[in-house]
Amino acid sequence: MCDDEETTALVCDNGSGLVKAGFAGDDAPRAVFPSIVGRPRHQGVMVGMGQKDSYVGDEAQSKRGILTLKYPIEHGIITNWDDMEKIWHHTFYNELRVAPEEHPTLLTEAPLNPKANREKMTQIMFETFNVPAMYVAIQAVLSLYASGRTTGIVLDSGDGVTHNVPIYEGYALPHAIQRLDLAGRDLTDYLMKILTERGYSFVTTAEREIVRDIKEKLCYVALDFENEMATAASSSSLEKSYELPDGQVITIGNERFRCPETLFQPSFIGMESAGIHETTYNSIMKCDIDIRKDLYANNVLSGGTTMYPGIADRMQKEITALAPSTMKIKIIAPPERKYSVWIGGSILASLSTFQQMWISKQEYDEAGPSIVHRKCF
C-alpha cells in the first residue's frame, strides 16, 4: 500500500456517547461528535427551509428542541442499524470528507459483541459503502496496544458501558471479560439527582449537558471516601463554584466525589453489582493462574469515564487490598486515555505487518459476511 493520503486507512471508533474518527497514522482523531441521530418531531413546520429528514451528531444536538433524539449504540452494542448507517455516512462524507470506496476502514467493537453484529457491520461496509478492505478490532485490545503492551488487563469505561478485559499476547480472553452497565451517562444522571437534592433543578436534556460539563470539570475520586465525607462536612475546603450559562453561580461540595464514587459503590444508584475494583479482581481471578502476575502489573485505564483525578491511586489501593500481599500491582493511566481506543486503531492500521490482516472486498465476495470471524479475533 502506498503511503500517500489517497489510500490512508480510516479508523472509526463508535462509542455509545461519542464517535471518534480519523486517519491511520495521525496521533488524534480528526472528528469527535455525539453518536446521535435526530428526526423532526413535526413534519415541515418551516416552509421552504429544506428540512432534512434526519440530523446527526452536533447538528442534531443543537437542533434538539425540534427533534426526537436516538442513540443507535446502547451499552456499547449497535442496536439500530438504519441510524448507525446514517452515522457512518455522516462520518465519511461530512466529517472526514472522504470517499469510503477509496480507503481501507478499521472499525471497533465492544467486547463480547454478538456474532451477527460483526457480520452486519462487515456487510454494511462492503455493500453500502463499498470499502476496498475493512477490519473489526476489539476496543479494549486497541487501548492496550496504544499503551505499548500486548498483555494486560484493560478497564475501559465510556459513556454507556464499562468492561474489564484481560488480554494475553494480543488476544482478549472472552471467558474472563466482565461487563458493567454503569458508565458516564449514569454518573451524569446521578450528579443531576444529587444536585437536585441540594436545591438546584436540572431536568431537561439541555441541562443534562451542563451537568455533564460540571462532572467533567469538577468531579474527582476520593482515596478514602469516609475521610473525604468528614472533611467536606467540617470545612469548605473541598467546595468549588461553577457558573451556569445564565450567569447564576452554584456551589458544589461533596457531590464532587460522591458522583464518581458510584463506580466503586454501584449501590449508590441502586445497582447490585460489584464496583470496578472488584470486577477487575474477579476478571483476573477467572484467568489462568500463570498469567495473573502479568495482569496485576499491567492494569490499563481507558475511556472518558476513567479521566477523574484520583482514580488511578484509588484503584491501586483497592486492588492491593484484594490481591495477594506479595503481588506487584501497577495501574497505568495514560494522559490521552479518552482517545486511546482510537489511537490504538491508528497505530494498528498503519503497521506494515497489519496490511495482510485486512479483509479485502474480494475475500468478502467469495466468503460473505462470516469471513469476519475468520480474520478478526
Swiss-Prot record:
The gene is actc1. It is an enzyme of class 3 (hydrolase). Keywords: Acetylation, ATP-binding, Cytoplasm, Cytoskeleton, Hydrolase, Methylation, Muscle protein, Nucleotide-binding, Oxidation. Oxidation of Met-46 and Met-49 by MICALs (MICAL1, MICAL2 or MICAL3) to form methionine sulfoxide promotes actin filament depolymerization. MICAL1 and MICAL2 produce the (R)-S-oxide form. The (R)-S-oxide form is reverted by MSRB1 and MSRB2, which promotes actin repolymerization. Monomethylation at Lys-86 (K86me1) regulates actin-myosin interaction and actomyosin-dependent processes. Demethylation by ALKBH4 is required for maintaining actomyosin dynamics supporting normal cleavage furrow ingression during cytokinesis and cell migration. One of its GO terms (biological process) is actin filament organization. Actins are highly conserved proteins that are involved in various types of cell motility. It catalyses: ATP + H2O = ADP + phosphate + H(+). It is found in: Cytoplasm, Cytoskeleton. One of its GO terms (molecular function) is myosin binding. This is Actin, alpha cardiac muscle 1. The modification Methionine (R)-sulfoxide is found at residues 46, 49. Its main location: cytoplasm. The modification N6-methyllysine is found at residue 86. It comes from Xenopus laevis (African clawed frog). Its EC number is 3.6.4.-. PANTHER family: ACTIN. Belongs to the actin family. Polymerization of globular actin (G-actin) leads to a structural filament (F-actin) in the form of a two-stranded helix. Each actin can bind to 4 others. It comes from the Eukaryota.
